[in-house]
């Protein structure tokens, strides 16, 4: 239940949730780049990675609840919920910026979570 509350807060906050820490994140990235982190690890990369990670638990939770053989429902749930969030941002949150890239990253996260559930189940079955 706490996960759902966090997901809703992050997705439906009136302004981008990273806005208060954007300057700090940019400074941290500059510092990391000065120490050898590749240039492609930029603000956009961090934002996309956060979108992926945010939906991993969703895919896993749905796959666990639905049961064996239907792991893909976790992935589908991620796609549908992400589309609903982006539509809500478009229609009701003028301070937010809905994008297809967010839908793709969120869906990837849900797929990874669902596949992780599948992998754990298979390992448990194979264990003596």
For each feature predicted by the language model, list its residue ranges.
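Bulky hydrophobic segments
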Residues: 1-96, 114-128
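Alpha-helical transmembrane segments of polytopic membrane proteins
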Residues: 47-50, 103-108
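Non-cytosolic membrane-interface motifs at loop->transmembrane helix junctions
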Residues: 95-105
């Amino acid at each position: 239940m706490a996960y759902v509350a966090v997901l809703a807060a992050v997705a439906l906050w009136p302004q981008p949730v990273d806005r208060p820490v954007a300057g700090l994140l940019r400074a941290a990235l500059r510092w990391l780049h000065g120490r050898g982190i590749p240039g492609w690890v930029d603000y956009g990369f961090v934002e996309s990675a956060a979108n992926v990670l945010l939906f991993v638990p969703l895919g896993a939770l749905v796959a666990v609840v639905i049961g064996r053989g239907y792991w893909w429902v976790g992935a589908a749930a991620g796609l549908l919920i992400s589309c609903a969030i982006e539509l809500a941002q478009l229609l009701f949150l003028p301070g937010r910026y809905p994008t297809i890239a967010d839908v793709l990253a969120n869906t990837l996260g849900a797929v990874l979570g669902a596949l992780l559930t599948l992998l754990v189940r298979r390992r448990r079955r194979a264990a003596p």
